[in-house]
């Protein structure tokens, strides 16, 4: 049977781990609040620019932009948004699984791929899968700016315009709630025409462009792509902190359960030890009295 000293050592070790996981849980809660507030504050702009693009696509365009061209697909590009650190459950695993399904499907159709990875975890994982990593971006801070993403966005758009990629996808974790995060893969380019209902069709209109409509359209569409990527990274950061908070809470709860079980075991061993000592003392006293 395990001794009292070993049980005490285990309890001390688990208690130290519990303190660490509890501290990490509290840190994640604090970070989650800050990033979630930032994500929510940017959503109105995100929703409005989506509405603008929907109306632009359904309207009668004076200039048909390259971003709307449907091509024969020979090569795709995928922007993958992951985390830099672990301890966030299966957040990255589920996303990578979804991306691999899409990549495998295209490879089976002899379609090549180019990857743009954000986060150390995606870079480490997809390095073992393909050599076609065009651009990688790691160690983004929680207070990152859209300018930090511009080089990657510029390269991906230039590759699409020049015909080096025919479709551009964006893979990230979508935040639904603190408990539910959904691995999501959306097509960025070519921009798809939205499916509108009867009520929405009646609300569509054409824009009147002042000055050069071609230049204005190009600026709006580029801003739309930029903000899609920016918002996806914000959502992924929120998902990361929510997943880490839940993972650390689970670890803390498991530590408490282990400590409870060890405490009971400790009490039993100690009780057995005391009983044995008392028995030995009584037996010794009885032997002395007989002599």
Swiss-Prot record:
Gene3D superfamilies registered for this protein in UniProt: 3.40.1380.10, ATP synthase, gamma subunit, helix hairpin domain
PROSITE patterns, A to Z: ATPASE_GAMMA
Record keywords: ATP synthesis, Cell membrane, CF(1), Hydrogen ion transport, Ion transport, Membrane, Transport
This protein's record includes keyword Cytoplasm: no
Membrane topology per record: Peripheral membrane protein
Entry's family note: Belongs to the ATPase gamma chain family.
Subunit structure and binding partners: F-type ATPases have 2 components, CF(1) - the catalytic core - and CF(0) - the membrane proton channel. CF(1) has five subunits: alpha(3), beta(3), gamma(1), delta(1), epsilon(1). CF(0) has three main subunits: a, b and c.
Record's function text: Produces ATP from ADP in the presence of a proton gradient across the membrane. The gamma chain is believed to be important in regulating ATPase activity and the flow of protons through the CF(0) complex.
Name of this chain's protein: ATP synthase gamma chain
Organism: Buchnera aphidicola subsp. Baizongia pistaciae (strain Bp)
């Amino acid at each position: 049977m395990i001794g009292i000293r070993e049980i005490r050592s285990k309890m001390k070790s688990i208690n130290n781990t519990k303190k660490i996981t509890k501290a990490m849980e509290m840190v994640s809660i604090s970070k989650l609040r800050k990033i979630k507030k930032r994500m929510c504050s940017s959503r109105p702009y995100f929703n409005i620019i989506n509405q603008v693009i929907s109306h632009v696509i359904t309207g009668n365009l004076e200039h048909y932009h390259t971003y709307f061209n449907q091509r024969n697909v020979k090569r795709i590009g995928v922007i993958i948004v992951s985390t830099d650190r672990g301890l966030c459950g299966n957040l990255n695993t589920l996303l990578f699984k979804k991306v691999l399904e899409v990549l495998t499907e295209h490879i089976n159709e002899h379609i090549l791929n180019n990857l743009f990875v954000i986060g150390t975890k995606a870079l480490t994982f997809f390095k073992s899968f393909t050599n076609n990593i065009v651009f990688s971006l790691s160690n983004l801070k929680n207070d990152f700016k859209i300018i930090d993403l511009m080089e990657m966005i510029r390269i991906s758009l230039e590759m699409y315009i020049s015909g080096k990629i025919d479709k551009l996808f964006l893979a990230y974790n979508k935040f639904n709630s603190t408990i539910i995060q959904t691995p999501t893969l959306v097509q960025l380019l070519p921009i798809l025409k939205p499916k509108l209902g009867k009520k929405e069709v009646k609300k569509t209109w054409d824009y009147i462009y002042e000055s050069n409509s071609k230049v204005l359209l190009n600026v709006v569409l580029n801003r739309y792509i930029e903000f899609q990527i920016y918002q996806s990274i914000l959502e992924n950061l929120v998902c990361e902190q929510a997943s880490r908070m839940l993972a650390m809470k689970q670890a803390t709860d498991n530590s408490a359960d282990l400590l409870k079980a060890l405490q009971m075991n400790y009490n039993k061993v100690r009780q057995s030890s005391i009983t044995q000592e008392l028995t030995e003392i009584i037996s010794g006293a009885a032997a002395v009295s007989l002599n």
